[in-house]
Amino acid sequence: MTQSYVYVGLAGETAPGRPVKSGLYRMAVGDDRWELATRGLPEAPAIRAIATHPEQAGTVYVGTQHGPYRSTDHGDHWEKVNIADHGLPVWSLLFDPRDPRVLYAGYENCEIFRSEDEGERWRELPVTVRFPEITVAPGSNPAKRVLKMAVNPANPDEIYGAVEVGGVLRSLDAGEHWECMSHGQYLNDDTVDTHGVLVGRWRPGTVFAIARAGLFTSTDQGGHWSSARIESLNSKGQTYCRDIREVPGDPKTIWVAAGSNFQSDVGALFRSKDGGASWSRVKMGVEPKTTMFALAFDPRQPRRMFCATNGGEVFASEDGGESWIERPLPAGATQVYAMGCA
């Protein structure tokens, strides 16, 4: 049987007062020991994105402050893929489910690159949507980071991007043209500070977006949005959502990682068992002490799942989230941004 590994990426925030941590940790499933897997990565690697190859378990891509890197041996060694380093970090990576040779990389400053040969050559896509098109605030800054991307498995030319304080972007032609799907949604920065996006497979046309203000649902490919009813976790009546994942092979079951704010003492998981029609908070049996930031599933055994807080707490479940055990990172390893499993 092929050995599965779980990966956790750390990246320091540069805002005043926030500590800088970085690195990539790896754990073999069935073991309880974490090890650094940074050979060949840049010094003090800031890992904000992890993408595991859908057909080759040993091939993993990570996004760093110096562009994407690739490993073909489960993270034992890394090499930089051939894309010009322009000084901005990679925040998201996405495989085309129809052709895993095709890979997208989402950068800071709302840039998206596409490779059609597993990262050997890259082309910047014409993303022209900017922050003022989403808000009505005069003199607003350009939209920032493409924090996550998602693709419609039934039509891989349909791609979405979640942009920090920039809403949701959509392309219907594999990235050649983009449009803003958040017009009219702006109430304040909270509603368009978008952290993730997911194309639901259970109901065609359904798209989910998570943000600082909570969870939003569209039933018309992002044309219109409504707020999902989930338990609020902060004084604003909001839930700070950071990751959203569908269980492999089970399109009715969707998970959301959340907390009360970016850095908080509340970490929570929410689950839908009906394709996103209703949501409930999961009783984990353990108490996360910081905001839940990331989720990952073992594609070969989807009932095996992992979650992590930005404070470095990692939890594992072998029964689809019914029970959890702690698998904490080494002391001092915090600022978790990304997870992957393969």
What are these model-derived regions, one by one?
Residues 1-342:
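Extracellular glycan-interacting surfaces
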